[in-house]
């Protein structure tokens, strides 16, 4: 599916104390006001419990960051003598009036990193301080990419795993919207990794969040997820498997789930391309720690990218098996399914071929082999990640889709082996070399135009030509957002008090 990124939080920052503009005197103060709204939205978001409440709040955070982003871009252009911050792409908007901003003091924004390894994120006051508006803009764009990925994830999972089975139109609309969000996130991360404007930020930053290799890897990861979602839109096997597990679905009383013929060979090539994107992301994320920084990217993200590549290759093997089964080669199709299970680290429960039986050891060697297989399986399960699902609820099981793909493989293998044992009786070839001999991938996503930062419209620029008004913003305490998920009010009650009450009276 899509990785659930944590959104960073930030401390209070006053632009008017460090910047001034003689062309638009109200610009620094307006930027401070918009940033304060974003800061409150991020704090409120991370205090919500994971699940539906946090997913529903994403639109509020997106609205706040879209309102604030043009102000930061205007400040950056004003400090850049009115020139666009990215000279590699032509600007789509031209201002009738030029923005000039002067720097009176050093601007030092503070942001909490969310991709750094857990060993560096352990302290409660782990914000990193940067210098310049480049640092602020880089973190804002990175956060925007996380929000778009989170919107894509929540939209797909809430539709596919709803209590009522979605229609084909609902499924298509959800996947198309999620793909659009992921493509936007990919262009943003690519812009951060390639723009020379952020070169000084990446060199000075000690955390891996803003490193060019990290941003390039996140761009590839978003492309891998978008490609897999494109395949998922027409993957009737996953839909049938989810519908079979849905306790609220009653369509089976009327008719069996329809599984139309799919363009199996094309889908397999698309999944291979998604695997190539995911492997590029995993390599890039793993290499960040070797660039002389204090810490690398969190292992959960790197493991997720690695497992996502395995899931994509396993899905490609499944579609090759479907293609063989549609051609009447059910034995070859079963071999492809077992190759897919091997790629996922799942043990084959079906009957093994004669070649596989003769190569198995006996005694202690066989016991060691079983322990090694279980250890590798647990490692892949840990790397796939997961989310909490309410008791009796329906959910994907893990972030990378490994568990869902394993269910589909088990369903197809059980069906095909039964048919082969009773009707076809075809020999099942060895699946040892199937994954290694996969063809190259094929792109399905259209080329995306380079990301262009938004600019303020002429009406708002005209309003900021006047003098600033008195602004009173309470920075508040930064201790309240030290944790991403706040504890409930009743969890920290006084001993002897009734949980959930503010008083501590005895009765």
Swiss-Prot record:
InterPro entries, per database record: BRO1_dom, BRO1_sf, pH-resp_palC
Domain of life: Eukaryota
Biased composition (Basic and acidic residues): 375-391
GO biological process: cellular response to pH; penicillin biosynthetic process; positive regulation of penicillin biosynthetic process; regulation of secondary metabolite biosynthetic process
Pfam families: BRO1
Domain BRO1 positions: 1-288
Transmembrane segments annotated in the record for this chain: none
Disulfide bonds: none
Residue ranges, annotated region (Disordered): 375-405, 439-507
SMART domains in the cross-refs: BRO1
One GO location term (cellular component): plasma membrane
Family the UniProt entry places it in: Belongs to the palC family.
Physiological role: Required for the proteolytic cleavage of the transcription factor pacC in response to alkaline ambient pH.
Annotated protein name in UniProt: pH-response regulator protein palC
Species name: Emericella nidulans (strain FGSC A4 / ATCC 38163 / CBS 112.46 / NRRL 194 / M139) (Aspergillus nidulans)
Lineage of producing organism: Eukaryota, Fungi, Dikarya, Ascomycota, Pezizomycotina
Gene name of this polypeptide: palC
